[in-house]
């Protein structure tokens, strides 16, 4: 399967939609979706997704390089693998989304948005995961959704984990550290992200990986993501990651800043980095008569964005875990 990324960006369906290499069978399912099934029997299923936001290109380039290595036989495949480029039209245009933010739509929340290409795609991707995870009995299910952040960050690479009713598998968290993540953020409530969906509905060990800052195709320095790319290659091959490295700092979400009206003001400048700390009593945002104030001794901001639509999240506030 040559030129998967180029064909996806061009909106071209391949002439040949399935085939085999020495180590796996591959099948093109729809634009931006490729399934690889190892020739040997495995009990592990992995979803690797990127491009849910079309301006976040570094992870897409990373996935394209991993696919090339798989097809060239440089990496043996020891997982059932589903590769998803989430929003091909937005990727082609170089925009975050064409109509609405798809990463707020999963878990059926697409029904709450005006119908668009993104709502239809979110519905398709939900069905794809249903088919993929249920087709064969698998002991281990992982989903890694690769993103980049709009803003710079005090942690260049970090992970955001969905709410989960049972404790997290420490092996999974250790792998995230081996993949170069400097911090892990744990959600406490449900949400509409792709990883919330896979975790809640299929019991997958899921994480949104934030890898640097959003840049156009061709402008990414992929060397800064070498630890992540190497960890993914090792994972696909069924090998254990290298031991050692620094344990990621852990945070949990303690509050959400929501823009409720056009009067909303975020009391941070546009250069405020992710994980910037704020002391207790600091005014974070104002929306008419409503004020959002830091209530813990120290809280750290994540994803501050005053330009979201009314009713959507304009930021998260975090607390550092011991």
From Swiss-Prot:
GO terms, molecular function: hydrolase activity, acting on ester bonds; succinylglutamate desuccinylase activity; zinc ion binding
InterPro entries named in the record: AspA/AstE_fam, AstE_AspA_cat, Aste_AspA_hybrid_dom, SuccinylGlu_desuccinylase
Catalytic residue positions: 210
Regions crossing the membrane: none
Cofactor: Zn(2+)
Pfam families in the cross-refs: AstE_AspA_cat, AstE_AspA_hybrid
Enzymatic class: hydrolase
Comment on bound cofactor: Binds 1 zinc ion per subunit.
Protein's pathway: Amino-acid degradation; L-arginine degradation via AST pathway; L-glutamate and succinate from L-arginine: step 5/5
Keyword Transcription part of the UniProt annotation: no
An individual GO BP term: arginine catabolic process to glutamate
Annotated residues for binding of Zn(2+): 53, 56, 147
Similarity remark: Belongs to the AspA/AstE family. Succinylglutamate desuccinylase subfamily.
UniProt-recorded name of the protein: Succinylglutamate desuccinylase
Naturally occurring in which organism (per UniProt): Citrobacter koseri (strain ATCC BAA-895 / CDC 4225-83 / SGSC4696)
Chain's gene name: astE
